[in-house]
Amino acid sequence: MTELIRDRIAELVGVGMQIAQRKEALPEFESPPVVVERPRQSGHGDYASPICLQLASKAQMSPRVIAEHIAAHMPAAPFVGHVEVAGPGYINITLDRSWLTAQVEAVLEAGESFGNLKIGHGQKHQVEFVSANPTGPLTIGSARNAVIGDTLANLLAAAGFEVEREYYVNDAGSQVRHFGESIYARYAQSLGQETPFPENGYQGHYIVEMGRQIAQQHGDQYLDLPRESAVRSLGKEGIRRIIDEVQRDLTALDIEFDTWFHESNLYESGLFERSLQMLREKGYIVEREDAIWFTHPDLEADAVVIRSPQVIQEPSERPTYFASDIAYAWNKLVERGFDKAIYVWGADHHGDVARVKAAAQALGLDPERIEIMLYQLVNLKRGEEEVRMSKRAGDFVTLRELLDEVGPDPIRFMLLTSSVDATMDFDLDLATEQSDKNPVYYVQYAHARISSLLRHAIDQGWDVEAPGDVSLLTHESELALVRKILELPEVVALSATQLAPHHLTFYAKSLAAVFHSFYRDCRVVAPEEAEQTRARLMLTRAARLTLARTLTLLGVKAPERM
């Protein structure tokens, strides 16, 4: 089941249009792509196409007349039960009931591959996400980034793309020096030295604790080094420790990366200098005001690439974050040959989007090969009370603390209950509440209820794997559940192509609700109705498989018992 029903219907509408034109029922015109969507109101079929509303001016005919001609010439298909023209010119399609119920067997046959598609055609997509500065523990903002990126990677893989997950370690910027100075101060203080804490240093107990641990493990060896050398060494040691902690936290969130790419590699390999030279040769680099600038007609203002010592009042030139972005784009799209590079960034980086795309274009690359997702902030709440956080001040809740309090499943699910471009609240109390108000509990409970139902059937002597006559599935709640199950491939396609993984949580909640309605309306195990029971057990198994598949794509466990 790797082909979307929606696409097959669009093809039928297109063929109907072509046949009508050949028979001169419609004039010749060039049609835009046929759009097929799900009607908002029940009773308007399973699918609808508004294409005729777009064709009126081209055909010089009313949309309804165009729709009638297309509907009359659409070829028959086993999955189409009824075609009708409605309203001002919609073509409504109702799926054939026999074909619909037969899909229960197809879903069970597909098994864990149900929902997989081939729309990616094996193209190489890289998703780079989290990539938090290695100067402190991950917070809930980083957790949202992590959940968005990992779920998107799951969806892209299911859609048929070859996917690589990457974490970009920012270990070449000025923040690394500030980090090293902060650690040095706390390290020296733990050894009894009166060392002032840097004005722009990183606050927080974790810096104090790191300094103490390094003092315990290494004694005063860093005090014997020249201060600059000690700061540099402690900065590297601090980054190593933070990255180890980040890896542990992300593993607890069931996230693993294929690659950990260090920013410093861009400079040590000479790639930054080479990319800068390419831009210079093409006329995109100018030098003024003691700095090196990138200039491009698509940008409202030039972007600084390198600041000189006179500007930053430090002993060496200092590349900006944007400088690294230039070389990094070349590394991804050319040296490693990804067809598309997807970045997951916080919305505070919105100003960098145009610069990165302009730099890619200036290097001779198609900027459309770069996709940048911008996600909004998360407000951490406990009921109605907001929990404040600030990495610099040290007053923040870490991802580790969040994991310890609510666990990985509520984090992964609830951080995807809003679109990425919407600011969202994460309620710590709701995340642990065992009620229908908690969306992850509601969905997981549906899976556990199905599993319990199947165990009960086995206890009653039923072979739940036995085939049944699915044509007996005629109750509206049964048919509604089949229809909802068959939406999964479309949700995968929509989420993957629009880079919108939140559709998956919406679908999971909807599927759970439709199953609960089926469970309420239809007695599954009825000894006096053996054939009906076998058919409903098949549908129940298909629902469990689909719910488990959805939760797996979300990176959330599908419990057998709750």
For each predicted feature, which ranges?
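Non-catalytic interaction-recognition regions
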Residues: M1-A102, E109-E112, N116-M562
